[in-house]
């Protein structure tokens, strides 16, 4: 099945070229990488354009504003669907997600509708995170599990693979999450729609180049968004 990897970028000039070249080593003919750049002031968008002219599997989508992870992914999803992708992947550009693991997610999609690259599934692990970041991540997953009644272990991770049918069925226009709540919301909507979601273990390593995008507003959004999703589901308003 033809896959498109959506790669959102904001100030990733050091990481973009090595990431794209690494993905080129593991993707197969017909697969694409879509760089979704939010007008990075460091010139990431220009680097993406140069690489798209050199690497035949790379496309670039320029967005005029930095609006957050969720809107960037949604724009990428619509573009990938319009271009005929059968599988659509999310991953980070900073090497937190290993390029070679994209193949594992794609292969796992043969038996599932959504595949989560899981830090907390048996065999998964996290490298070089401090205690506070580990607590925030694990606590966020447990919080979402409890309120939404889910057994999946990693609900906030951003390494995912969707079958085309999932993105066509869930109401993408109703998704307004900007930060990591986006990951919880898309998975929850897929489950509510009856799709099969599985986890495969990955090794997650924090970025070595560039700055983290984590912020207080991202955490606060997830805190209120999770109960809002549960309430919408109880009212029959979630698709």
Name every feature range the model reports, one short phrase each.
Residues 12-26:
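Short, well-formed alpha-helical segments that are part of the catalytic scaffolds
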Residues 37-46, 95:
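A conserved acidic beta->alpha catalytic loop
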Residues 1, 149-150, 172-239:
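Hydrophobic helical membrane-anchoring modules
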Residues 23, 76, 94, 163, ...:
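Residue-level signature of catalytic and energy-coupling elements of molecular machines
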Residues 14-18, 42-51:
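Acidic helix N-cap motif at the loop->helix transition within catalytic regions
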